[in-house]
Amino acid sequence: MKVMETDAARRSVIIRGPADAVNKAFNVQLNDYEYERGTYRSHDGPVQLPSNLADYVEAVVGLTNRQVHAQHFSTARRHGGRALGKESNAKGRGAAKDPANTRPLTPVQVAALYNFPAGDGAGQTIGLYEMETNEGPAGYDPADIAATMRALGNLPMPQIVDVPVDGVENSGQSDGETGLDITVAGAVAPKAKIALYFAGGETQNIIHCLQKMIHPSGNDPVPSIISISYGWGPDDTGTPSFSDAEFAQITGLFEDTATNKITVLVSSGDSGAQIASRTQAQTSYPASDVWVTACGGTTIGNVNGSSFDEYVWNDIGGAGPGATGGGVSARFQVPDYQESVTIPPRVHTGQHGRGVPDISGNASENSGYLQVIGGRPPEPVGGTSAVAPLYAGLMARINANLGRPAGFLNSTLYGLPAATFRDILGAPGPANNSFGRVQGYNAGTGWDACTGLGSVHGQALQAALGSAGPAVVAAAPAPKASAAAD
């Protein structure tokens, strides 16, 4: 066994060795296994460490290379060639209709409707997390990005920096998700640097990517904002994406972002309360992590100057079916910052936990953003994937305007006056995020598990962050699952 790298800030030691040495070091037996997508390596028996090390090791990752069942939350994967500008009246369970005159918008238009402060994000770096999924590798074609920026109003090309992780690079082919992240964030904050981190689909790749984003070293970019438009599976204890020890490692990294004054925005999902189960409501991870700001979805329509209607996003039965993700975490307790709001018990179990999302924004494909994918004509794309980078652009403006990073947002968000948000009541329009056969949660006054606190009044948020002084790290409960080596 050979030590390849040690990093105190990342709390990691990377070692390499032949299978026999690994088996002996951790008292396991490495084997190859078959599953529906091929073969993977894993081990028989629990990982065991010498007694003099066990108390100091939080997790052992990399013994298993099965790909995490990740999803990107963009409607790009379900394009149907729908005519542009067509009014939408999608109907289905929980989806009464869209607002009148719902049409594709641009990120700049939505930023104006949400009263974002003036600014361009100069001097800020937005880190965009991109990863390989079972749909293929992540990537973008610069020609598609340039064409999309023209379609969105002849906007300048974003300042893009590619950051490979574990040897994974831009595939060079537009996957829809990566381009949406780039163009939405780049439209709102045109002078911010857009750092694209490309990760593989294994647990160790996810951890290595987060370490690189949160604890940069050498020539790594230094992001003040991180946007994640992916889900790594439901956060239920016992689900296969991560072991308890891996969960502890990942949420520990997110906790580090608060100390490092990095704002983390995560999409809440595009299938309502349904994540993996076809019958029970779940929340998506990492949106449910207590150290991130989870972003749900709305539909905007009937725009007339600064006036507009905004509904819960639930387009079941429409050309681009989808609904805002949200619910109650099965893994994380109610954090201190959410004690001021009423979080319903988890559907089906009655369990109490962290509520998702925290805020929301324009997500419906029907009011979405034009995207050029593979050189084809522009088509509107939506999803909560469009919300996280939108608010990443807002935070780049705010950080640049205030001259300092805002850092962890949630402690501030839940202490702000109601006027800081546009409350999405659920009537008229969809009143819940039920999806398929899964019963979801109802929208209503104040925080709800469809749209959180609502869409954000950007100028009001900047004023609140400006008067609050430097960001303060607020306490939040650790996950319920205890950490143990895997």
For the regions a language model picked out, list residue spans one by one.
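Substrate-binding/charge-relay-adjacent region of secreted/lumenal peptidase catalytic domains
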Residues: M1-A9, I14, A19-G297, T324-G325, ...
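Exposed, interaction-prone regions of secreted/extracellular proteins
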Residues: G318, V334, V472-A475
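An often Trp-containing, charged/polar helix-loop segment at the C-terminal end
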Residues: T299, I343-H348, M395-A449, H457, ...
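Short clusters of hydrophobic/aromatic residues that line enzyme substrate/ligand-binding pockets
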Residues: P286, W313, Y337, Q371, ...
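Phosphate/diphosphate-binding glycine-rich loops and adjacent basic-rich segments that engage nucleotide
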Residues: D309-A319
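Short acidic, Gly/Pro-enriched loop/turn segments at secondary-structure junctions
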Residues: G301-F308
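Long, low-complexity intrinsically disordered segments that are proline/alanine-rich
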Residues: P470-D486
